[in-house]
Amino acid sequence: MPVTLPHSVKQLLQDKAYGHVVTFNAQGKPQLTMVWMDVDGDEVTFNTAEGRNKPQNLRRDPRIIVSVQDRNDPQAYAVFHGKARVTETGADDHIDKLAKRFLNADKYPFRRPGEKRLIVRISVDRIGGFGPKMQPWS
């Protein structure tokens, strides 16, 4: 059952949060990728593109694990376990929003001609890790 994300976790994800995303390939082996993180309500989100391994893996097996370290307190980190869904809706605007946050660019500058952007939306089942001062996230 999905959990409600604490305010402190949402703040972490709204900062320049880099996530290490684990998906599982067709052989069940983990694939690890670093991405720019975001949050929408109680869903943890990131952006990717069609043709990459992440969306292919997630369409076949929606299990996902994401680790995010707090840039302001390196001992603090959150680990999200959940199920992901991949959608095109709003993905172009989303990557531009992230480009503004991470690159201070109005438009994502690395878009390739014909590239189809995707948002991965994670329904979080469990949050691990430690918040600031080694306290649980709350």
Outline where the language-model segments fall.
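Residues at secondary-structure transition points
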Residues: 3-7, 31, 49-53, 113
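Short secondary-structure boundary segments
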Residues: 49, 70-71, 124-125
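Extreme N-terminal tail/first-helix region
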Residues: 1-18, 138
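Short secondary-structure boundary/capping segments
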Residues: 10-11, 36, 56, 110-112
